[in-house]
Amino acid sequence: AMTSIAQSKSYRGFVEGGYGAFVGSKTGSVLSLSTSHGKMFGPIFVGGGIGIEQAWVKNESYLEGYISESGWDSWIGRKTFKGINVPVFANIKGIWNNKKLSPTFEVKAGFDLGMAWGLMGEAGAGCRFDLGKTALATTVFTKGVYEPDNLVTDDAKYVEGWFTSLGLKVAWEF
């Protein structure tokens, strides 16, 4: 009989929600919901995932331009931008033991689609809590780095540069 990966003892899935605040030269915040699926190789999970994020970038500079009688003129404006991103990523998690409380780490690397097209990476460390027969919760403090090729806002303004966030995520494991 064929066994699907979801029926395999080494299969793991995660659903996680989180909040992060941008730090450094960017200010704002991001709410996220994602899912990862893959296999356990001993204490290491290897898989991939997809998510959805709502981001707000406050008082961001942007370049505005227009053609005047004297030629091309431009100026720097400031505005709060918001938009949806869809991160697609590879995911590695380490779980040290299977006790009621276990230290854990995770690394994600991939690509953001949506408002900010570009590379994304995230690293985190936290604790995994055994809540009974099938429920396992993980709380992870994360640092995310995003490098959009061009962040295009709803009104076609462009924002460039690196975004760094610090956050907290809570996951349910199955």
Residue ranges of each PLM-predicted region?
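Structural signature of outer-membrane beta-barrel channels/translocons
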Residues: G38-G42, K93-N97, D112-G114, G126-G132, ...
